Swiss-Prot record:
This is Dihydroxy-acid dehydratase. One of its GO terms (biological process) is isoleucine biosynthetic process. It comes from Rhodopseudomonas palustris (strain HaA2). InterPro entries: Dihydro-acid_dehy_C, DihydroxyA_deHydtase, DiOHA_6PGluconate_deHydtase_CS, ILV_EDD_C, ILV_EDD_N, IlvD/EDD_N. Its EC number is 4.2.1.9. The gene is ilvD. The lineage of its organism: Bacteria, Pseudomonadati, Pseudomonadota, Alphaproteobacteria, Hyphomicrobiales. Mg(2+) binds at D81, D123, K124, E491.
Amino acid sequence: MPAYRSRTTTHGRNMAGARGLWRATGMKDSDFGKPIIAVVNSFTQFVPGHVHLKDLGQLVAREIEAAGGVAKEFNTIAVDDGIAMGHDGMLYSLPSRELIADSVEYMVNAHCADAMVCISNCDKITPGMLMAAMRLNIPAVFVSGGPMEAGKVVLKGKTHAVDLIDAMVAAADSSMSDEDVQTMERSACPTCGSCSGMFTANSMNCLAEALGLALPGNGSVLATHADRKRLFVEAGHTIVDLARRYYEGDDESVLPRKVASFEAFENAMTLDIAMGGSTNTVLHLLAAAREAELDFSMKDIDRLSRKVPCLSKIAPSVSDVHMEDVHRAGGIMAILGELDRAGLIHNSCPTVHSETLGAALARWDIRQSNSEAVRTFYRAAPGGVPTQVAFSQDRRYDELDLDRQKGVIRDAEHAFSKDGGLAVLYGNIALDGCIVKTAGVDASILTFSGPAKVFESQDDAVSAILGNKIVAGDVIVIRYEGPRGGPGMQEMLYPTSYLKSKGLGKACALITDGRFSGGTSGLSIGHVSPEAAEGGLIGLVRNGDRISIDIPNRGITLDVAADELSRRAEEEEAKGDKAWQPKDRKRKVSAALQAYAMLTTSAANGAVRDVNRRLGKGK
């Protein structure tokens, strides 16, 4: 039977000094035999998805102590990708994931915590904490701050549900008046919470449910709704129970690596494909699986993408459908229920709240559940009042969305498409693969071929788009923006948003070794691996080269003869120390970012660090 980790610092004569310090934090004699639970918070006033978390850590802490544990709270950093977007601040977003994972490891191991509750929400925070949970493998429960309410705006006499992306597109649309743009800006982000569409933050919080590490409703119940308080309360009680089951009952089934098994990662990716989640989730699931020492790879994602249908389309893939609408249709448990009925998930996987996922679905899938409380829970509605206060309203819809033929969530028979919402493409320009969010691609451009227009920074591409130098049929190539080449693998949300504003969203393709925001739609292909900075073929593309994209057959090809590509590669290698580097660009790369670039790996491996690279053993 494993001993409580915390006893390293709370038991024995030689730990008198440590106990003295624990006492200075408020612990009493009776506390030294209890599990010490880390409350891993991420409150910050910089991020709307985290601005309301300040008091929620202490809410969880009180429930932990009521259940018989000792709670100790600390915070990680949190970067707002939307505020960091479109300038050099975005270089820091993906690297912050590793810092978050490390900071959790440092705090939990330095103080010998027995278990943890992870309070996350936005883009890199949930993945960073998930990586830490897999790395540490101590009992863990995830609870997020919840989605923002969608904005409501009246334009030309019609009410629209809007979000951050709509504001960005409007700002670049010269046909919109300054007044309408300001109305959109003031309406797009009305409350605290993670941005209201199926962007990266909400995608990851939904996947935490599928992995079995979060409570039902984690991904979909609004940050402002009173129902969300129950998740925090239950998280506090659940983690104490899990800690006791492991340390006192020798029950290893509660550990993150047992809950988030290979099959659970398949479930999460299956959900991701079915709901058309952010392409960033691919990076994060690969990274978390690596921390769990699981052999879960791009090949597994490709395999799943070929058999899983698209059962839901949410902004940005369609307008006017946001997380509040997904919740009304039964949330993530409803999508998992449809996947289960189609035989596409492993329902025997354990979860932190139920013996198996199948047992959870029996209670929480609204097509199966007989519980009136569950049905009431999924009728939670937006309050419609701008606020930064959690749990501030308790409005409910009159009825649920149970339409599985034309509703927000479809059954497999009535799927939006038989192919899912994400796909892996392979070809000479992406030997290790690249990712496209097919849920956001118009059917008319699932196959596409056009001349390349090459840019060696996002900034140059944006200037060309806004300067009307891009025309219908072009394939925009943005390179040297990968994990090493950026460094930091910037998101390309502004280029795709500006293409929309120019009326080119369905007329051009964009290919990059960088990545895309969860708010991106259109023929946007990212994570091209190997990246240009690692000698990838994307580094050899020249203006005018034809690039062909075939999503149905999962192909992407640079249509240039092999001998010509060999000649270009030799020419590049002849540059010596300047080989596989971008032309001069005005970009300050700090020592912190240089350190990240030295250790990071390909997007095909989750862009995680590999210390063997520094030791000369890695690729």
